[in-house]
Amino acid sequence: MAKAVYVGVDSKARKMKKAYIGIGGTARKVKKMYIGVGGKARLCYSAEADKFGTATPLSKYRTLLAGTTVGGYALFGGGGYDSDARKGEAIMDAYNASLTRTTAASLSVARQGLTAITLGNHALFVGGRNGDTSFGTVDVYDASLTRTTATELSVGRCNSAAAVVGSYALFAGGRKCDFFTLTQSAVDAYNTSLTRTTVTPLPRDSYACAGGTVGGYAVFSGGNYMNTASTIIGTILGSINMVCAYDSSLTSSRAEPLSCKRTGHSAATIGNHLLLAGGYNSTTGKYLSTVESYDASLTRSTAVELSSAKNGLASATVGEYAMFAGGYKGNSDAAYVATVDAYNTALTKTTMPDLSVGRYGLASAVIGDYALFAGGISKIQSTVDKYQDVVDVYSA
């Protein structure tokens, strides 16, 4: 568990986020501090990432939910259940910086497979599906958790990717589910006034791609182009290696492709790097542990591999760490992964304590110094404890 030090500022206790000490005329960051208690050194401060524990569970167990942050809250919205029923929920759970859970206004439409991102003072929950119906709904929450709606997506779809660049949130790709899946290439951009603009589409149809931001670009990578009735991400043919970037004027360009085809991977930004981790390669039929990095000039390199090959993982950036948690690596109960890897700004990897339950289809959100990983599915064969309401908390 990470430790903290507080100092008094204007009669209030303020958490010290960073500490430095002078060595040879150079400021060196302090990673840990100890104090003597009863003749023993006790850790009182740590700037390193660690597992904090668990928070109050979600108000209802579910998978394929979406998470993001607005104001003083981490939000987890929507989600659903098994691939037969494909049932969606409208629940919105909110956690404050003390990890106290409240329930905010429900989504306007119950759905799973939706996408969420923060833009300015708004949290956007976009798209999704319920049964065989896809939605273009855009629910918007402000810092007081008041919900409004914005103009719908140009095409109703689920499993899209999101990224922010400049004053825009972009939603790219996805799939439209109306009894049969139709993969999409559409890209919709919303500005801070929540006005929608439809921009140049992806170079090809893609769902289960990953979106993130680096430098002055919103970047979308990989995904799956197959039109299919399948609901299992990444277990069919069709993964791709495209990388498409949009600048703050919404001009699109192609970047160096991924080193291999991947779908169901996850993206997180740390420092000047956008990390793309895990996924499934349909050409080799393998789950992936590789991690690719794009810098601000969109030059590609590689980072240390994940501790486990997997797709369907979640990611979050908290403090000076990008974390990748959970996932799935095969068709059995034992294939649900609990590993959590953290990368610092130097791309050094630390393997964290495991999630309390191995699972995929979980969502992430950050509040203060905490990264929360919530929900998911943990079994495929058994009907007991199949869906999860657990919220694992990591600190940095």
Where are these regions (language model features)?
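Kelch-like beta-propeller repeat domains
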Residues: 2-8, 12-14, 21-25, 35-396
